[in-house]
Amino acid sequence: MLGQSIRRFTTSVVRRSHYEEGPGKNLPFSVENKWRLLAMMTLYFGSGFAAPFFIVRHQLLKK
């Protein structure tokens, strides 16, 4: 009896919850503005690419 009521509650909660659906709606960032997306991706990937070079430069300049 208790198990059935718990099962009904969990399925009704899942059924009542609704999220936006469609391309790009399940991402943690917005893809609506392509120029902002380009800038954010450039910063993200560019910082990862440039970090080793800055670290080597820092080590070479260190006395």
From Swiss-Prot:
InterPro entries: COX7C/Cox8, COX7C/Cox8_sf
Topological type in the membrane: Single-pass membrane protein
Positions carrying N6-acetyllysine: 25
One GO term describing the cellular component: respiratory chain complex IV
SUPFAM superfamilies, sorted: Mitochondrial cytochrome c oxidase subunit VIIc (aka VIIIa) (SSF81427)
Family annotation (Pfam families): COX7C
Mitochondrial matrix side: 17-33
Chief place of localization: mitochondrion
Metabolic or biological pathway: Energy metabolism; oxidative phosphorylation
Keywords, in A-Z order: Acetylation, Membrane, Mitochondrion, Mitochondrion inner membrane, Transit peptide, Transmembrane, Transmembrane helix
Positions in the Mitochondrial intermembrane compartment: 61-63
GO terms, biological process: mitochondrial electron transport, cytochrome c to oxygen
Location relative to the cell: Mitochondrion inner membrane
Keyword Amino-acid biosynthesis: no
Transmembrane parts of this sequence: 34-60
Residues with the N6-succinyllysine modification: 25
Transit peptide per record: 1-16
Record's function text: Component of the cytochrome c oxidase, the last enzyme in the mitochondrial electron transport chain which drives oxidative phosphorylation. The respiratory chain contains 3 multisubunit complexes succinate dehydrogenase (complex II, CII), ubiquinol-cytochrome c oxidoreductase (cytochrome b-c1 complex, complex III, CIII) and cytochrome c oxidase (complex IV, CIV), that cooperate to transfer electrons derived from NADH and succinate to molecular oxygen, creating an electrochemical gradient over the inner membrane that drives transmembrane transport and the ATP synthase.
Family: Belongs to the cytochrome c oxidase VIIc family.
Subunit comment: Component of the cytochrome c oxidase (complex IV, CIV), a multisubunit enzyme composed of 14 subunits. The complex is composed of a catalytic core of 3 subunits MT-CO1, MT-CO2 and MT-CO3, encoded in the mitochondrial DNA, and 11 supernumerary subunits COX4I, COX5A, COX5B, COX6A, COX6B, COX6C, COX7A, COX7B, COX7C, COX8 and NDUFA4, which are encoded in the nuclear genome.
Protein name as it appears in the record: Cytochrome c oxidase subunit 7C, mitochondrial
UniProt source species: Sus scrofa (Pig)
